[in-house]
């Protein structure tokens, strides 16, 4: 209802976030091209970073040392090249990707699986502030919505939708990362994967997008 929408807007603004509808001229153009484009995005920071070339770096929360180094190298390389890094601010690969991009002077965008006024995981509150100061944190969910397991697969279409391509850094066979890669393929985005240890369980999801072409 209109009353609920006004309350949501008020809550977001109190938190310091803005609201961008898909008919807004500044709404990310690439996102408009995808099926099930979000009607609104709550934005903390500056979403103009989405106008640059964007690449999503995604992967497991339970990363290996190899995965960490790969995410760090990619995040730094993309950030230093003026390419915006998009990820989900989860533990592991996402966190390293965001941090390393910012450390290289780059812009980054985090797509949350909860409302903009919440932070998941909670220990990434400081990272959230850093991302908002060097890009944007976005969410399509109501501002106070708590994280739910069903929200993460839904938001993954936005991670791939904002991006020209998705790079799977390290992932298990059945994972949210695989969902993001599948969305990317459906959206006509390029999908890349970091070569990994074929014997590691956290690499099985890395090879899946390669097999799917």
Enumerate the language-model features and the residues they cover:
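Helix-hairpin-helix
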Residues: 1-7
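Glycine-biased, small-residue-rich flexible motifs in mid-sequence functional cores and linkers
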Residues: 7-14, 18-213
């Amino acid at each position: 209802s209109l009353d609920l929408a006004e309350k949501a807007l008020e809550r977001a603004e109190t938190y310091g976030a803005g609201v961008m509808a898909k008919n807004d001229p500044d709404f990310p153009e690439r996102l408009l091209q995808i099926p099930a484009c979000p009607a609104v995005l709550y934005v903390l920071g500056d979403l103009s970073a989405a106008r640059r070339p964007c690449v999503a770096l995604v992967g497991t929360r339970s990363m290996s040392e190899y995965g960490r180094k790969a995410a760090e190298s990619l995040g730094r390389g993309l950030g230093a090249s003026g390419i915006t890094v998009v990820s989900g601010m989860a533990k592991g690969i996402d966190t390293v990707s965001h941090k390393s991009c910012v450390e290289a002077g780059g812009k980054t965008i985090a797509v949350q699986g909860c409302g903009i006024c919440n932070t998941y995981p909670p220990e990434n509150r400081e990272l959230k502030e850093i991302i908002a100061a060097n890009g944007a944190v976005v969410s399509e969910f109501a501002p106070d919505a708590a994280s739910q397991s069903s929200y993460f697969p839904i938001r993954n279409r936005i991670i791939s939708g904002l991006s020209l391509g998705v790079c799977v850094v390290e992932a298990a066979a059945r994972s949210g990362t695989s969902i993001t890669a599948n969305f990317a393929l459906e959206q006509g985005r390029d999908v890349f994967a970091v070569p990994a240890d074929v014997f590691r369980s956290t690499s099985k999801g890395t090879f899946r997008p390669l097999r799917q072409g």
